[in-house]
Structure formats: C-alpha cells, structure tokens
Amino acid sequence: MLLCDIGNTYLHFYQEGKVWKELPRRLKAGMEVQEVYYISVNPPSARRLLEVYPHAIDLAPHMVLDTAYKGLGVDRMAACKGIEDGVVVDAGSAITVDVMQNQVHLGGFIMPGIASFSSMLKSISPALEKELNLSVELSALPQNTRDALSYGAIKAIVMMIQNSCKNKRLFFTGGDGKYLARFFENAIHDNSIVFKGMLKTLEEMKEGKR
C-alpha cells in the first residue's frame, strides 16, 4: 500500500514506514502497487499522481473530524487525526497550528512559514533582502540587520506556538518541523503524522464508520 499527501510543492509518500517526497514533474511509476490512497491541496499535482497511478483513491470524502471549524483543509484534518490529543504544527510554506483534545479539534490558525517571512520582508525593501540566519540567538537582541530579520521572523513563530500550546504536547511535522521543534522541551518531531491520520481513516472505512 502506498499513501500520498499532495502539498503545495511536493508529493509526500509513505510506504511501510518510509517517508519521501517528489516534485510533480519528476514523478514516475515505481514498483507495482495495488493500493494507492491520497489527499491533496493541489489539484494539478493530484492529476499528475492519477496519470501515474490511475487507480489511486482520494481519501478526502471519507475523512471526518469532530470540529466546529469551517473549511478545514484535508491535510490539517489528517494531521489532527494523526495525534488525537495535543497541538500539531505543520511547518511548510505556511505554518498551520491545530489544537486537539480527546479526538476533538478545538480550533487552529495559519501563519507564514519561515521562507514566506523572508519573501515578505524582501518585498518591503531591497535592503531587507537577506537570507535568514536559522542559528540566530533568540535570548539576546540582534546587532545586525540579518540577525534582526531572522530574530523577528523566528521568534514571532515560536511565541505564537508557545502561546497556543500551554501545557499540551507539541507535535511537529513538515519541512521546517524538525528545526522548530528544537525550541520546545515538550516537542515531538514526526513526519508521518499526516499518514497516521490517513491510516486511521482507512481503518474507519474498513470498520464501516465512514
């Protein structure tokens, strides 16, 4: 069985505990796979997957989450189902933060990812076109422009997450998940969280719950 989480840039795959990613244009059929299931926030990339795996099944219509949130993306739903309790942070081009309690989604928010902060600052002034310093010290005020930009972007993200997690366990996934997790003592980095939610949905389908 092959699972695919189709994001804004990459197609993320999961098979027998292994996780990897591919760009749509580089996607090729691998070994013969009888079962392929996917979720997608990118229709063109989903069409590309279906060109390679025409029998792939979209799990979105079968995915259900106990929430009052209107319009919650299927990727966020899968991540929430993958943890059941705690705060899940999916740190990609955008960062989503969702709070779960006893399998109930209490709400969440979206903010720019680290790379997006850099792009926004560059659009303000050419003088702010600096590569962010991911090693910047957050406990001391910066003494140069590059560190000042880096401090402002990274500390804003970290503090937003801190204010939301309270005493809950934090789960990080996504491209910048491992980097952000190091700022939190109670953090777990797991790039299979979304796939765990997809697997749970498949279990519910087999049990006739969906």
Swiss-Prot record:
The keyword S-adenosyl-L-methionine does not apply. Pathway: Cofactor biosynthesis; coenzyme A biosynthesis; CoA from (R)-pantothenate: step 1/5. The active site is at 75 (proton acceptor). GO terms for biological process: coenzyme A biosynthetic process. Its cofactor is NH4(+); K(+). One of its GO terms (cellular component) is cytoplasm. GO terms for molecular function: ATP binding; metal ion binding; pantothenate kinase activity. K(+) binds at residue 90. The keyword NAD does not apply. ATP binds at residues 5-12, 93. Pfam families: Pan_kinase. A monovalent cation. Ammonium or potassium. Its EC number is 2.7.1.33. Substrate binds at residues 69, 73-76, 145. Keywords: ATP-binding, Coenzyme A biosynthesis, Cytoplasm, Kinase, Metal-binding, Nucleotide-binding, Potassium, Transferase. It is found in: Cytoplasm. Catalyzes the phosphorylation of pantothenate (Pan), the first step in CoA biosynthesis. Belongs to the type III pantothenate kinase family. PANTHER family: TYPE III PANTOTHENATE KINASE (PTHR34265:SF1). Homodimer. This is Type III pantothenate kinase. It comes from Wolinella succinogenes (strain ATCC 29543 / DSM 1740 / CCUG 13145 / JCM 31913 / LMG 7466 / NCTC 11488 / FDC 602W) (Vibrio succinogenes).
